[in-house]
Amino acid sequence: MSTKVPIYLKRGSRKGKKEKLRDLLSSDMISPPLGDFRHTIHIGSGGGNDTFGDISFLQGKFHLLPGTAVDETQEDSGFEMPFQFTRTATLCGRELPDGPSPLLKNAISLPVIGGPQALTLPAAQAPPKPPRLHLETPQASPQEAGTVDVWRIPEAGAAHSELTTESGAEEPFLSHASSLLSLHVDLGPSILDDVLQIMDQDLGHLQIPT
């Protein structure tokens, strides 16, 4: 066979047997996609009407593209080339045409954050505040802040005495538990008396009569 034929199409060592193309090709011959390959620039057969991407290498010479050649008579008559939505056309300062651009006909613009669209959004309602337990208690003014504890203590004592007289002697513990302003803590038998007695005994032994 000719040397110009690719190596994967050449016959093997077996003679007289025609090999099929699917037997010669394998998936290992297909190179994986390159990570740095990007289709960022495209110039189609239509020339200026079929381009996108960064074509700044043209340096504004759009007449070099196929299909965009304009004769001198059209240039003198004031004929303008159609606007191309490319980076170069935008940087060159070419003005937008009055008519809608075919490239932007089906485009959908996203709302700008903080723009006029943001004013029409419904305001988020704040969550309801939890109920407070001290709403029923009177609020003291800053001038009476020092006397708050003075007039609250008799009120708590009066409520405690009223509950005690109503419940009677049969339920003394309920009167303490029903009052929110009173605190009843039972620490059990106190050992303070025992400690004081031991201290008195030690002092008695230390004092020797003269």
Curated annotation (Swiss-Prot):
SMART domains: PBD (SM00285). Residues 30-44 form the CRIB domain. Probably involved in the organization of the actin cytoskeleton. May act downstream of CDC42 to induce actin filament assembly leading to cell shape changes. Induces pseudopodia formation in fibroblasts in a CDC42-dependent manner. It is a peripheral membrane protein. It is found in: Endomembrane system; Cytoplasm, Cytoskeleton. This is Cdc42 effector protein 2. One of its GO terms (biological process) is Rho protein signal transduction. The modification N-acetylserine is found at residue 2. The modification Phosphoserine is found at residues 31, 101, 141. Residues 124-145 are annotated as: Disordered. Interacts with CDC42 and RHOQ, in a GTP-dependent manner, and with SEPT7. It comes from Bos taurus. Its main location: membrane. It holds the Pfam family BORG_CEP. Belongs to the BORG/CEP family. GO terms for molecular function: GTPase activator activity; opioid peptide activity; small GTPase binding. Signal peptide: none annotated. The keyword Transcription does not apply. The keyword Mitochondrion does not apply. One of its GO terms (cellular component) is plasma membrane.
